[in-house]
Amino acid sequence: MVPAACMLLWALLLSLEYRAAGAEDQTTTPTATTIGMQRVSFRFGGPARSLHSTNPTARTTVPGKLRVTLEDENDALATADRLALPAAAELLSTVTGYSRSSVPSPSDWEEDGSLEEGVVDTRKTTNGPVSLFSTTNTVGSSGTTGRFLANSQEREIKLTTDVRSLSSKTTVVDLSSESTLQQWSTPGSTPSPWLKPSFTAMPSPEDLRVVLMPWGPWHCHCKSGTMSRSRAGKLHGLSGRLRVGALNELRTEHRPCTYQLCACNRHLEECPLDSSLCSDHSCSSRAPFQSSTTSLVPVHLRRRPILPPTSPSPSPALAFWKRVRIGLEDIWNSLSSVFTETQPVERIQR
């Protein structure tokens, strides 16, 4: 412990002496000071060593300036670290693909400060677009330094995402969608403004008006003992939906046939004897024939009984239900004729 303290004191004295001598010799012999220089370094824990210059003329001609440097183990480690720093930076640049000067600050990274292997993050502090792209293991040469980059990127595999473009897309408002949504207010309400109906669309039932045409001629059905006639109609306010002749049989009327209107066989009594449906002359001419054939009742009269001619006026209830039955038959015939005729037309238009 004592020799070390003595050596430290002696080194301090030498340094002060040579510093004063150097200040005096700086004005007289500046060249000699720069030509010959001796560096003496003392290291604790070992003998002092002197690093002399290899120039023999500097030893004999001009006394050189002596510089004393005190070093310990920590200074040696710091010097070694400083000398190894460029080599470490070089090794880091060859492994990761970016130099030490281009390493961003820790605030630019994520909270944990980690980065996945094989991914180079070029994010900046500005609000510009963020570009993330994966690396490919292709070797590229640098023209300035001659180093080989382990990870070089190609333009074909870059994936860029613009954050500002996403925010700008959300500001676009579809006016057409808002106008259609405003047509409906609360659930259960009716839409306010509807589009104008086209001319080819089906009009509302209030706009349709049926005009009945005159009755057609009687059609005799001698085998069934009936005759029928039909009445056509026209729809005003409807165009292009029904073919011509679709409403030719809008109403159909069925009645027992008469020999005055139908050329049926009287001997077979195909038509019933009804005084209300024939004139007095025709009924009187058939009177003897009727008396001779009272025992034979035709089959169609059994299936379809009629009121006897002796009753002057039927009961009001029977007359009412008869009118109801005739009205229902007319409605059924009109509906069946309309829908059977319009069904193929609507199928074609669809």
UniProtKB/Swiss-Prot annotation:
Keywords: Phosphoprotein, Secreted, Signal
Signal peptide residue numbers: 1-23
Maturation and modification: Phosphorylation sites are present in the extracellular medium.
Tissue: High expression in testis, but low in other tissues.
Transmembrane segments: none
Compartments (UniProt record): Secreted
Observed effect of gene inactivation: No visible phenotype. Mice lacking Ment are viable and have no overt fertility phenotype.
GO biological processes: regulation of cell population proliferation
Task of the protein: Involved in control of cellular proliferation. Onconcogenic modifier contributing to the tumor suppressor function of DNMT3B.
The protein's name in its UniProt record: Protein MENT
Species whose genome carries this gene: Mus musculus (Mouse)
